[in-house]
């Protein structure tokens, strides 16, 4: 059953490669995501450093890091995504980024160097084996390195509505594959056994009618925004 769920999610993204690539250029919600993630990637990466992009999708953040001079490995379970990324890499003539086909959490760690920064944007909520995946991430981060992860916000009012409506009438889009919701502190508790400590968290949202309505209420962002990104540091000696 776990494999079937994973394959369904991977299949959905594989079937929509161009759609997800174009969203970063056309969708207000994806533009907001890129702006927030861009700030974090500039802050926590350095030229010549090593980065891993787990669940790289169409490679938006992998190429962003590569353009900053970072050595990047992008990994995704959708083969069509990887092929599209490799075509883009070849077209641009980049030598500091490469892409690997692999499904979480069954990644061959021996093929990867430990990373100064490991990122995973809107990926782990689809993975049944959440703790196993987080343990893998932590192992791949260097001591005092940085782990940046985004997940659906469990406190979001719009997410609560989505969960209820999906339970009443299952949706046909990507939301039906979501398995996990969290908060920054809940995620920190899951990562604590691996020496990871929360440094900062930012909230953002998909720009839907419901999200716009939530923002007009002037409630705390942890209630109005349906996604968060947490930045974790691996403490010395771990």
Question: Language-model segments: what does each one mean?
Answer:
Residues 119:
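A conserved beta-strand element that flanks and buttresses the S-adenosyl-L-methionine
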Residues 1-45, 48-57, 148-170, 214, 218, 222:
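Conserved class I S-adenosyl-L-methionine
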Residues 170-186:
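Acceptor-substrate binding/catalytic loop of class I
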Residues 131-143:
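A short glycine-rich, Lys/Arg-flanked "PGG" loop and its adjoining helix->strand segment in the class I
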Residues 122-126:
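Short catalytic micro-motifs in class I SAM-dependent methyltransferases
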Residues 58-106:
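Class I SAM-dependent methyltransferase SAM/SAH-binding core
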